[in-house]
Amino acid sequence: MKRRSLLLAAAGLLSAGLAPGLIPPARAASVVNVIQEDPSAGHGIKHMALVVSPHAVKAGEVVFHIRNISKDLTHEVLVIKPPAKLSSMPYSKKQNRLIESRIDKLADSGGQKPGQSYTMKVDLKPGKYLLICNRPGHYRAGMRTWLTVTH
């Protein structure tokens, strides 16, 4: 009887994907597509923007596929954990951008020239994150959006 119970328990673990080693199977990474756009893209866009899809993903590894559709401008994507009050974001009027040494920056795509793409992976915990382009003038021109990470 005891042996049968052990066999049934082992079969249950196998069917649940928890054996061998009793480690649950890895969850696939979430994928977020990010389009960097501005008026030079020629799609009737009248402002700068980061277009993100989807706006919510599960916690864990997140893969960002970033594409710059601009014809003229280099853009970037920073993933930041924002402060409680956005009004307290450290902004340099002289540099016309956020002061990166004073923000909680989790990832930086570097600069994508017009037509370039880039992929980056970031491990994110549940919470709200701000995706921004911090090239001079771009953050204030609207190149920012939110990403929600759930359990």
Where do the PLM segments sit?
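N-terminal export leaders
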Residues: 3-7
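Bacterial N-terminal signal peptides
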Residues: 9-20
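Sec/Tat signal peptide C-region and signal peptidase I cleavage site
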Residues: 22-28
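Extracytoplasmic
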Residues: 29, 52, 59-61, 72-74, ...
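N-terminal edge beta-strand
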Residues: 29-61
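Contiguous segments within soluble domain cores/interaction surfaces
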Residues: 62, 68-98
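Extracellular/periplasmic metallocenter environments
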Residues: 71-72, 110-151
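Extracytoplasmic beta-sandwich strand-turn segments characteristic of Greek-key/jelly-roll folds
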Residues: 85-124
